[in-house]
Design a protein with these regions (language model features):
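ATP-dependent adenylate-forming carboxylate-activation enzymes
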Residues: 99, 117-135, 147-150, 291-311, ...
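Conserved adenylate-forming
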Residues: 86-90, 208-221, 226-269, 291
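Gly/Ser/Thr-rich phosphate-binding loop
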Residues: 314-317, 327-390
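Short hydrophobic alpha-helices that are characteristic scaffold elements of the AMP-binding
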Residues: 110-115, 137, 275, 285-288
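N-lobe entry segment of adenylate-forming
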Residues: 1-86, 91, 171-196, 212-217
Length: 390
């Protein structure tokens, strides 16, 4: 039996897309910028290669502070030197990032990836017994965590004897706010129990500023990350993704859309990095496309609206409840949405009626973007590369 006509049309469209992707010497893009093919590169190699054509630009942002690509790379290299010289980390080792969505997690991911270290992303609000289980099962060589969330884990990490890298909100605070932030953090840390083996993120960077160490290259088949997902039934599952898996997301998504103004066009990251949706699409994809990423440690609909109005936001990915809250938050519906070109949602279904209402709002504000659905927060990374207006 022949397939229905609409299926034949979609197959033809898929053929055109495939041929387009592999045309022009395997470079995706149009205009002034192109996305390089993934080759055998690891994630950090791919980031460097994909973004070198853009020069220096604002790569990441923490609230009001923007960080240039050159500074971002310098932080990555300095932290890689810390991991190599202080902890002796090497290819195949595992290191745990136990942080909310922040700039330090991105720096840590690329620094560890440079060395060939597998990054185990763990939900930062899990109870300390679960943290112990993940650290022990992966034989993790250390843990990066946020000072504000560290109190309940001091005994566990001291018992395990693993070195701790402590992040603070002040690490990337704007100059006028840094002193006040450090004062408040100092008060809290004074009353918190103490880690036996601890280095602060800022001191690690300062100690190894401008230091460079050799890394691993062309190891695309190596495992890059462990993502500790919840699964649907039974015990939680650990997803292992290779460098190639992670790099294919920005490579394929670049066909759907590419950056027009490096460092000016931005994406607010409202998803965690312990899911591929947050790490690969919201984080790695936006960074490799020279978008300015604005990580938020917790979802705040009013703050998202504020950032939308102050920045040129071109992409947003999230879960259904986030988009529902945004839809009902005063000020989200407005002309600032006209800059948006991509929106993806995963983790659960949205009702057809809500999708219609939300997409009507987007159309009303002059954007061709539509809210596109995926599946789980990890599985959504595959359909996001093909689920377009076609």
């Amino acid at each position: 039996m022949k397939p229905p006509l609409f299926c034949m049309e979609k197959l033809q469209i898929a053929k055109i897309i495939f041929e387009k992707i592999w045309s022009e010497e395997n470079m995706i893009g149009s205009g002034n910028y192109t996305m390089c093919e993934t080759g055998n590169m690891n994630c950090y190699q791919f980031y460097l290669e994909a973004t070198k054509q853009y020069g220096d630009y604002d790569a990441v942002q923490h609230m009001d502070l923007r960080v240039k690509r050159s500074q971002f790379i310098d932080d990555i290299e300095s932290l890689a030197a810390y991991f190599s010289n202080e902890l002796g980390l090497k290819r195949g080792d595992v290191y745990t990032i136990f942080c909310p969505t922040n700039v330090e997690s991105l720096v840590g991911f690329y620094a560890l990836n440079k060395l060939g270290v597998i990054v185990s992303f763990v939900h930062p609000l899990l109870p300390t017994e679960m943290l112990r289980e993940y650290v022990e099962s992966a034989n993790s060589k250390g843990v990066m965590l946020l000072d504000l969330l560290s109190k309940d884990h001091v005994k566990t990490l001291n018992d395990l004897g693993v070195p701790v890298l402590l992040c603070r909100n002040s690490d990337y605070a704007a100059p006028l706010k840094k002193a006040a932030a450090r004062l408040g953090e100092g008060v809290l840390e004074a009353v918190f129990p103490k880690f036996k083996n601890c280095e602060s993120y800022s001191s690690a960077l300062k100690k190894y500023r401008k230091t460079r160490v050799a890394g691993v290259s062309n190891n695309s088949a190596d495992i890059a990350v462990y993502l500790n997902g919840g699964g649907t039934t039974g015990k939680s599952k650990t997803i292992m993704l290779t460098n190639k898996n992670v790099n294919e997301v920005p490579y394929k998504t670049a066909y759907i859309d590419e950056i027009h103004e490096p460092g000016e066009e931005a994406e607010i990251i409202i998803l965690p990095f312990f899911h591929a949706f947050g790490l690969c699409l919201a984080g790695h994809m936006a960074l490799c496309n020279a978008g300015r990423v604005i990580p938020l440690m917790r979802f705040d609909a009013k703050l998202v609206v504020k950032l939308y109005k102050k920045n040129n936001i071109i992409a947003l990915v999230g879960i259904p409840n986030m988009f529902k809250k945004l839809y009902h938050t005063k000020g989200f519906d407005g002309p600032h949405l006209s800059n948006t070109r991509m929106m993806f949602v995963g983790g659960d279904d949205l009702s057809p009626s809500f999708l219609q209402d939300f997409n009507d709002m987007l159309e009303r504000n002059g954007t061709s973007a539509r809210l596109r659905q995926g599946y789980g927060l990890t599985e959504v990374c595959a359909p996001c590369c093909a689920n377009t207006n076609w």
